[in-house]
């Protein structure tokens, strides 16, 4: 019985992953509004009923895709930071910000995470999902920076939320800009100045 349940659970997980995998390129290429559920279930090789077994609606499926994108970008950012061998918390934060801005220039990330997600999910849910993958690292870096005297003592949570709020706004700025390269350059310069300013007396 346990083996049968595990097999059933595995099949359910595979179906869910198939739906996310099918929906992701369609959301990226056509946007949320124009990605039809019939096209998604056909690409996933499942029925419409199977979709509704795993997701309440199209918005719920989109949220799962967005969360996958956020998780992958955060994981790759962590790998890039680890590969840099940088240990200074403020430099790590700067590297992370630069990586995030570069990642958000990717058309798939841009369309799903920056163009559609705020409109489809609403500001509150969009920021909650985004913070889930980033705020822990920012808190840890700020805490280390304070403990090592790298920056003056300051409220960690308020500072972390301020940094993430600024990052959200500049990534939206880059996504909506006509000249993405210029906007990326401007955004990087502003965020780097913001991070450097934390260490000022």
Task: Please place each PLM-identified region on the residue numbering.
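Amphipathic alpha-helical segments used for helix-helix packing
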Residues: 104-124, 172
């Amino acid at each position: 019985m346990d083996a049968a349940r595990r097999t059933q659970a595995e099949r359910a997980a595979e179906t869910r992953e198939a739906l996310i995998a099918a929906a992701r390129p369609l959301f990226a290429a056509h946007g949320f509004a124009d990605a039809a559920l019939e096209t998604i279930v056909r690409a996933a090789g499942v029925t419409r009923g199977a979709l509704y077994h795993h997701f309440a609606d199209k918005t719920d499926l989109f949220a799962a895709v967005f969360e996958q994108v956020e998780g992958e970008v955060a994981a790759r950012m962590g790998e890039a930071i680890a590969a840099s061998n940088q240990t200074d918390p403020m430099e790590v934060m700067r590297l992370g910000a630069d990586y995030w801005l570069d990642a958000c220039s990717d058309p798939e990330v841009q369309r799903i995470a920056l163009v559609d997600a705020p409109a489809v999910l609403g500001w509150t849910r969009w920021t909650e999902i985004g913070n889930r993958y980033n705020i822990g690292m920012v808190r840890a870096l700020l805490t280390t920076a304070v403990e090592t005297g790298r920056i003056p003592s300051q409220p960690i949570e308020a500072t972390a939320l301020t940094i993430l709020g600024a990052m959200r706004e500049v990534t939206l700025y880059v996504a909506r800009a006509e000249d993405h390269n210029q906007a990326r350059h401007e955004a990087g310069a502003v965020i780097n100045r913001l991070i450097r300013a934390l260490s000022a007396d």
